Every structure is written in C-alpha cells, then in structure tokens.
Amino acid sequence: MFKFIVVGFFMLLNLQASSSDALKAFKNKDYAKAFKLYEKSAKSGDTKAQSALSYLYSNGLGTKKDSTKAMYWLKKAAEGSNPAAQYDLGMMYLSGYNVEKDSKKAFELLTESSNANNANAQFNLALMYYNGDATDINATKTAELLESAAIQGHKVAQENIGRIYMQLIKFDEASKWLEKNAANGDESAYYLLAEVYCELEKFDKAKVWAQKSIDSGNEDAAALYKKHKLDKY
C-alpha cells in the first residue's frame, strides 16, 4: 500500500520569494506595509506578489480577511503561469477547500505546475494517476512523476517510488530507491528489499535485508527467509 498524503498549500512560499522590501515588512510583522507593497507589485503583474497578496487576504494580515479577493489574486497568479499558485489552486480544487471540488481543474493546474518542475505538484499529480482521478490509471506515469519529485528531495515521493517500481516489475530501479529509504531509517523498506533481491536472485543481499526485517519484528520476513532458504547464503 502506498503512503500517499495530500500536502498543504504553499502561498507562503511565493510571499517569501517576492519583493525584498515587502518581505522585510512581513518578517517584521508590519503587515499593513507588507500589504501595501505586495498590492502595488501585484497590480503591476508580479505573479509572486499576486500569490502573496492572496495569502494576506486569506489570513487577514494587513487588511480585512477576504476570501473572495484571496481567490481572485490566486487565480491571477495561476493564470500568469506561477507554478506555486497553480499548485495551490489545484490543491484547493482537488480537496474542495474554499471552492467546489473539481478534479478536472485540479488535474489541469497540477499538470501545468508539474511541467514547471514543482515537486509538490508532481507528487500529487502522481497520486491522481495512481488512483485514476480525472484521468486514466497509469502506473508508468505515476512512477515518472514520483521519481521527478523524489530527485528534488520530496520525502514522501522517495518513500513510495520503490513500491511503484516493484509493481511495474522494475526491480533494479526499486532496489535503488529502497536502499536509500532503508539508509534513512525506513524499516518497512527492509522487507521490500528482501523481496526485491529474491526476485533478482541476489539471495545473499536478500538474506541481509530479510534478517534486518526479522530483527525489527516483521513476521512476513521470517516466512520469506524460510521460503527461499536464505540460511544457505
């Protein structure tokens, strides 16, 4: 079973990437000044400022909380091809947060953000392909997107990419990622590595990982150890 999660919204990332003067005011909690500066840049077409302004409206910082204006500026930023805004808006449509749930719109926005190499969009788009949400189920596309996100350091993508490669019977690729997971302390990877190395007929390695899994209390690993007679290796 894949350990997918829906991660949160990232309007704050655009806020932090915008005008240095506006960011300085925000960090100093001078929200009124930050709002004024972001608003000026947003009206000039700065998509990062538009997304930041959406965040301020959404949270009532430096201005009265206004969900309608927050959505207006987020959509403007997304229409301006801002990857983080496309991701935020896509996730809102995917979850039905403050908007009517619309998986088709979510898929389109996450695809645009993913094409701009947004790791969070790639991860959640992979989930949509995996579940067939607003698209056909496509394990190969799931793997491609997960690997793209994993290479960028997306932790949950890294935890899942090995599993999807196992489903695709690409055991060499699976072992590469599962080894990384195991090195990072993911005990569930121990048993999966034992399975993978049995499939690859690398029984000496399978024995090592099966034993680690047994030591961590996995009864399935003990059965695997016995089934493949790993004590011989």
Residue map of PLM features:
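Sec-dependent N-terminal signal peptides
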Residues: 4-13
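Alpha-helical segment of the N-proximal tetratricopeptide repeat
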Residues: 18-44, 59
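Hydrophobic face of amphipathic alpha-helices that form TPR/SEL1-like repeat modules
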Residues: 19-25, 52-59, 90-95, 99, ...
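Structural signature of tandem alpha-helical TPR/SEL1-like repeats
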Residues: 29-36, 64-73, 100-109, 135-147, ...
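Canonical positions in the second alpha-helix
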Residues: 40-41, 76-77, 112-113, 148-149, ...
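Short helix-capping/linker turns of helical repeat alpha-solenoids
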Residues: 43-46, 59-61, 66, 79-82, ...
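Terminal, low-structured helical/coil segments at or just beyond the last alpha-helical repeat
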Residues: 199-233
